[in-house]
C-alpha cells in the first residue's frame, strides 16, 4: 500500500480535483484506490448519518467500497470545537489509523489534508504529525495566485524533506502560464522539487450550478425552475448603455447577467445571447413581458434583495470553490490530468 498525502497551505487549491482526475486515470490502468479526507467542513446528512459531502462524492465517483464514514476522519462542528478547547479526547488520531488499516488492501490511498500543513494539529491529525507515522509520501497542490505561492512549496520541502514527491501548480491563468513554465518551474527544479503538473484555470470546473447561486444570494426564482441544475461559467454586470450591451454580451457564452429589475432593456438583450440565467438585484420584480420572454427562451430569472455589488461579491465566493459531484466535471478532471500530469513519472517514484 502506498499512502499519498495531498496537502496545501491555503484553501481551495484543488486537492480533490487531483484525486478525482488522477484516480480515474489510475483505475483505468487497473489500480485499486483508497481515499481518506482528514477534516470535513461540509456536513451532509445522509439518512441518519452526518458525513462530509465532498468525501462522500469523491468516494462515489471513484467507486471505492466502504461505509460513508470510512472516507472522512473527523467532521468539524461547534460541539467538536468546544471539546477541543476543553482538552477532551476526540480520538481523531485513533480513528484515522483505523481508517488507514481498513484500506490496507489498496494499491494507493490518497489522503487529503486541510487548508494548511498544520490544520488538525489540536486533534493530532495534521499532515505534519501523520506523514512519518504512516510512512506516507507527500504531493503539494498549490494554486498560482501570486509569486509567494512558491514559499508554500519550499516550506513543504523543508517540513517533509525526502517524503516530498513534488508539487502541482493549479488554476494558472492563461496569460501567466508561460511565465510559470519558464520561470517558476526551473526555480523549483533547481531546489530538487519535482513539478508533476501545471494546470490552467478551467471554465467548466470553475462553473457554478444555478441552484448554488440562488442559495448564495438568498434568491427567489421567478420562472424556469427546471433549469436550476444548469451551470454558469461566466458572470457579467449589465449596467451599460443598451447600444453597447449586445456586443458585450455576445462575446461571453454560458453566462449569468446581473442587473436591476428596472433595466428591462438590458434583460431583453441578454436573452438574445448565450445566457444561462438573469439575476435581478434590489428586490424588484421583472415586468410581465420579460417573464413571458424568459419562459419562451427557457432562461431562469432570479430576484435577490441584495444590491449589485453585494450580489457579485457573494457569487465570486462560489467560483472554483464548489464540490465536484457531477459526472461531466469528473470526466473533465480525468481528461486534464491525463494530458497535463506526469502519471508515469509519478508512479515510478511512489
Residue ranges and their predicted role:
Residues 1-5:
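Extreme N-terminal starter segment of soluble prokaryotic enzymes
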Residues 7-90:
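N-terminal phosphate/diphosphate-binding loop that engages ATP/GTP or pyrophosphate donors
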Residues 8-10, 38-39, 71, 112-115, ...:
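Fold-independent oxyanion-binding glycine-rich loops
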Residues 31-32, 104-107, 254, 275:
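Short, high-confidence coil segments that cap the C-terminus of an alpha-helix
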Residues 73-78, 82, 87-90, 186-206:
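Ligand-binding beta-strand-loop-alpha-helix segment within the catalytic cores
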Residues 81-123, 128-132:
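Phosphate-binding/switch loop-helix module in NTP-utilizing enzymes
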Residues 113, 198-259, 315-350:
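Non-catalytic interface/targeting segments
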Residues 114-194, 262-298, 302-324:
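Conserved catalytic-core segment of NTP-binding enzymes
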Amino acid at each position: 500500500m502506498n499512502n499519498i498525502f495531498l496537502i496545501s497551505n491555503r484553501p481551495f487549491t484543488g486537492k480533490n480535483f487531483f484525486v478525482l482526475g488522477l484516480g480515474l486515470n489510475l483505475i483505468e490502468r487497473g489500480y485499486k484506490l483508497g481515499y481518506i479526507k482528514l477534516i470535513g467542513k461540509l456536513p451532509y446528512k445522509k439518512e441518519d448519518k452526518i458525513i462530509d459531502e465532498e468525501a462522500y462524492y469523491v468516494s462515489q465517483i471513484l467507486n471505492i467500497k466502504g461505509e460513508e464514514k470510512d472516507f472522512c476522519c473527523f467532521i468539524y462542528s461547534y460541539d467538536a470545537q468546544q471539546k477541543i478547547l476543553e482538552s477532551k479526547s476526540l480520538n481523531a488520531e485513533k480513528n484515522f489509523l483505523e481508517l488507514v488499516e481498513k484500506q490496507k488492501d489498496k494499491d494507493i490511498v490518497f489522503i487529503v489534508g486541510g487548508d494548511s500543513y498544520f490544520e488538525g494539529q489540536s486533534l493530532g491529525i495534521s499532515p505534519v504529525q501523520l506523514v512519518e507515522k504512516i510512512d506516507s509520501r507527500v504531493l503539494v497542490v498549490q494554486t498560482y495566485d501570486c509569486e509567494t505561492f512558491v514559499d508554500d512549496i519550499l516550506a513543504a520541502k523543508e517540513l517533509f524533506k525526502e517524503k516530498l514527491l513534488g508539487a502541482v501548480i493549479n488554476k494558472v491563468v492563461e496569460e501567466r502560464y508561460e511565465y510559470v513554465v519558464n520561470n517558476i518551474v526551473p526555480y523549483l527544479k533547481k531546489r530538487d522539487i519535482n513539478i508533476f503538473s501545471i494546470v490552467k484555470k478551467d471554465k467548466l470546473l470553475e462553473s457554478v450550478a444555478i441552484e448554488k447561486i440562488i442559495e448564495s444570494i438568498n434568491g427567489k426564482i421567478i420562472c424556469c425552475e427546471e433549469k436550476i441544475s444548469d451551470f454558469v461559467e461566466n458572470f457579467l454586470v449589465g449596467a451599460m448603455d443598451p447600444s453597447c450591451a449586445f456586443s458585450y454580451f455576445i462575446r461571453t457564452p454560458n453566462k449569468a447577467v446581473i442587473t436591476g429589475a428596472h433595466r428591462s432593456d438590458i434583460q431583453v438583450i441578454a436573452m438574445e445571447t448565450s445566457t444561462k440565467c438573469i439575476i435581478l438585484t434590489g428586490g424588484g420584480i421583472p415586468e410581465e413581458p420579460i417573464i413571458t420572454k424568459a419562459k419562451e427562451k427557457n432562461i431562469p430569472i432570479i430576484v435577490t434583495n441584495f444590491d449589485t455589488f453585494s450580489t457579485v461579491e457573494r457569487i465570486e465566493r462560489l467560483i472554483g470553490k464548489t464540490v465536484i459531484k457531477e459526472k461531466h466535471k469528473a470526466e473533465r478532471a480525468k481528461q486534464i490530468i491525463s494530458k497535463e500530469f506526469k502519471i508515469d513519472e509519478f508512479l515510478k517514484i511512489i
